[in-house]
Structure formats: C-alpha cells, structure tokens
Amino acid sequence: MIAIIDYGMGNIRSVEQALKYIGAAYIVTSDKEEIFRSDGVILPGVGAFPKAMDILEEKDLVRVLQEIGRSRKPLLGICLGMQLLFEKSEELQDCNGLSLLPGVIRKLKVPYKIPHMGWNELKKEGEIALWNGVEDGSFVYYVHSYYADCPNEIVYGISDYGVKVPGFVAKGNIYGAQFHPEKSGDIGMQMLKNFKGVVETWKSSQLSI
C-alpha cells in the first residue's frame, strides 16, 4: 500500500489517477498511523515552500516524514514535494525543509519564461531502479519556478533550462522528481511502475524479517 500524503497542497487527483492506472494499491491520507503502516510514501505538492512546511508542521507530519525518510521505506517527492525533501528554500523567505537530502532550493534566474512550464528533455545521470524501461533523453512535464542546488552525487536526471535543473534526485530510499511523472505520459507511468516495484521489494523484505 502506497500512502499519498494529503496536506492540502498536492496534485493529489492526478497522482491518484496515475497509481490507479498502473494498478498500485494506495491510500490518500494525512493520518500518521496510516502513513507508518504503508509500504511506500508519495509526497506531492504544488504551491509555496514556506506554506507547505507550515502545514506539515501543524499536522505533525514533518516528524513523520523525517522518520520515514531515515528508515528504508521508499519515499517519492514530486514537484514541491521533492523540494521539501531538501535542507532549506529561499522561496519568499529562508525556510527550513525536511533535511532528508543535502541542498538548497533556489529561484530560477534564466533568460526564459518563468515558471518553467511544459515538456523538456531529461538526460539520465547514472542508473537507478526508477530508470528501468526509461530511455535517456525522454521528455517529461515541468511546472516550477525554483530548482534544487544540490550535490552531483544525488542527481540522476538533468534538464536544461538556461541552468542545469536537477530533474530527478535520489539517495538510498529517497527519490525526488522535479517534474510531474503523473503528467508525463508513458514515460512517467513507467517511472511510477518502477517506484511501485521498489515499494513491493521493500515490503517483501519486511515480511522475511
């Protein structure tokens, strides 16, 4: 069972439809016990970083997500949800994030239209489980005005938008997509299927303990 975190700022409907399409068992929840009982977690998000962190704090979900991230349970952040995984953001004001990944969220300063909206090429950097069946140079769908300034060793996908935008990051059990896999057609569905596979592998490992 995958828990989609519902905190009032997520693109939950489209994520829910995508999981339904790939045949994944899921629950939409903000209940701490349901999140802990899940086999994997998706943190979606659309909106401002400081407001999102305030809401997560109010719902006591910061602690929950940090515990999930520091365990081996698979966690996938999408768009703002990915940005929240980092140490802090410069959006509107300096604001601390979940600190599960090293790096800072900074505003895009490029000679192009902001937000970065639409399809862009994703160049793979290294191999991870979520790349199974995903061709290098596939196009994915973005909507964002901020990007992660983070160490190269956690960057597994890059798009060019005047700067090198980390499109996909990963460290251990933690994954983050700056783009929207649920809106990225067959390629996005394949990535979500791969995440489902990672979740199932983790679940099986727990049953054997």
UniProtKB/Swiss-Prot annotation:
Catalytic machinery residues: 79, 180, 182
Keyword Cytoplasm recorded: yes
Keyword Lyase: yes
Gene3D superfamilies associated with the record: 3.40.50.880
EC number(s) on file: 4.3.2.10, 3.5.1.2
Catalytic activity annotation: 5-[(5-phospho-1-deoxy-D-ribulos-1-ylimino)methylamino]-1-(5-phospho-beta-D-ribosyl)imidazole-4-carboxamide + L-glutamine = D-erythro-1-(imidazol-4-yl)glycerol 3-phosphate + 5-amino-1-(5-phospho-beta-D-ribosyl)imidazole-4-carboxamide + L-glutamate + H(+); L-glutamine + H2O = L-glutamate + NH4(+)
Residue intervals of the Glutamine amidotransferase type-1 domain: 1-205
Predominant location category: cytoplasm
GO cellular component: cytoplasm
Entry coiled-coil feature ranges: none
Subcellular location: Cytoplasm
Keywords: Amino-acid biosynthesis, Cytoplasm, Glutamine amidotransferase, Histidine biosynthesis, Hydrolase, Lyase
InterPro entries: Class_I_gatase-like, GATASE, Imidazole-glycPsynth_HisH
SUPFAM superfamilies: Class I glutamine amidotransferase-like (SSF52317)
One record GO biological process: L-histidine biosynthetic process
Molecular function GO labels: glutaminase activity; imidazoleglycerol-phosphate synthase activity; lyase activity
Pfam families in alphabetical order: GATase
Pathway(s): Amino-acid biosynthesis; L-histidine biosynthesis; L-histidine from 5-phospho-alpha-D-ribose 1-diphosphate: step 5/9
Subunit and interaction comment: Heterodimer of HisH and HisF.
Role summary: IGPS catalyzes the conversion of PRFAR and glutamine to IGP, AICAR and glutamate. The HisH subunit catalyzes the hydrolysis of glutamine to glutamate and ammonia as part of the synthesis of IGP and AICAR. The resulting ammonia molecule is channeled to the active site of HisF.
Stated name of the protein: Imidazole glycerol phosphate synthase subunit HisH
